[in-house]
Amino acid sequence: MEGVEDIPGPCLHEGLDWTWESFGEYLTALERRKHDIDFCALLPHGPLRVYVMGDRAMNLENANQDDIARMRQITADAVRAGAFGFSTSRTIAHKTLAGEHMPTLRAQEAELTGIALGLKDAGAGFIEMTSDWNTPDPATEFAMVRRVMEACGRPLVFSLNQRHDRTTAWMDLLELSTQAS
C-alpha cells in the first residue's frame, strides 16, 4: 500500500490493528474501528500471492498447482466472509516502496483462473483488474482475461486509461468489451 497507493507506513501501522491473519479477521478488525465512509473490501492478489508463495511470489515465479489450489480456497473463504471480490494488478506502474514490480505482474492464466474459480465456489464476488494490456498485446491479454471470466462466470471491472504511447488503446479495449458482452 505504501508503494502503490502512496499511503505512508506510519499511517498504515497506526491506523489498523495488525493482529489478524485471515480475511474474515481483517474485516472484523475493520468493523471494530470507527469509520465515516462506506467502503467495500476486495481480496488483494499481491498479499494473497505472497502469503501462499512467500519469496517465490516476489521473484515473479509461476504458481504451482498446490499454490493455485490454496489461493482458490482462500479466495472462496474471503468472499464467504464478506469480501466483495478479488483485485489484481498487471501494470508496471504499480511498484513496491523499494521500486520492485508487484508480485502479480505476470501471474499466469492458470493462477488467475484458479483464483476466479474461488469466486465461483463462493457464488459471489467480482474481479477488479488494472493492466497495461501488453502481454503481448491488448487483444491477446483481453482474450486471456475473457477465458478466466468465462470459467468463473463472475463479473470483471478494469481500469481504462489513456496512454501517450498508445493513443487508441482505450477505444480498442472498449471495442473488445463490447464484443465480449
Label for each model-derived stretch:
Residues M1-F86:
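Divalent-metal coordination cores built from histidine and acidic residues
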Residues A81, F86-S181:
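Active-site core of metal-dependent hydrolases
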